[in-house]
Amino acid sequence: MLIQAKIPLILNWIQDQSKVKNIYLWGGTLGPNFDCSGLIQTAFLNHEIYIPRDSYQIKSFCRHIFNFKEKNKSLKKGDILFFGNKNKCDHVGIYKGDGFYYHSSGKDYGRNGIGIDTLKETNDKISLHYQSKLISAGRITRSYRWNKAIR
């Protein structure tokens, strides 16, 4: 099955995980408590798509979609959103469509677990925080398992 065909399954898996009591856990990859990149990596891994562990590694692994100053109209469900500053990617989420995305965020600037935020105009403080830190987006177009690449 092609990666794009698995995206609805991946998004459903994340939605299911969000319904289980969870908190943000730095380094969390096993659930129910995840950090941002652990959630994304585990969601893809559960559907036999192997991607890197950390947000900056995932950013390098993805096919580039847009930079923060460009329009994000080309986003598709399952695209990966990268947050941080021009020097460093330090947060990641996955686009669920219609301007919304899933991510696991901490309690200081987030929802202390898996939540949904928006790229649309809003008054929500958490969404606004992450909108200000959006730097780019990418698309998972391949899987790797050590040195073996598959599509």
Question: Could you tell me what each predicted segment is?
Answer:
Residues 65-70, 96-151:
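Aromatic- and glycine-rich peptidoglycan recognition patches
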Residues 80, 89-102:
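Catalytic nucleophile-His microenvironment captured as a short glycine-rich beta-strand/loop
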Residues 1, 75-78:
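Loop/turn positions that initiate beta-strands
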Residues 1-21, 146-151:
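Intrinsically disordered, low-complexity
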Residues 20-76:
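Catalytic cysteine-centered active-site loop
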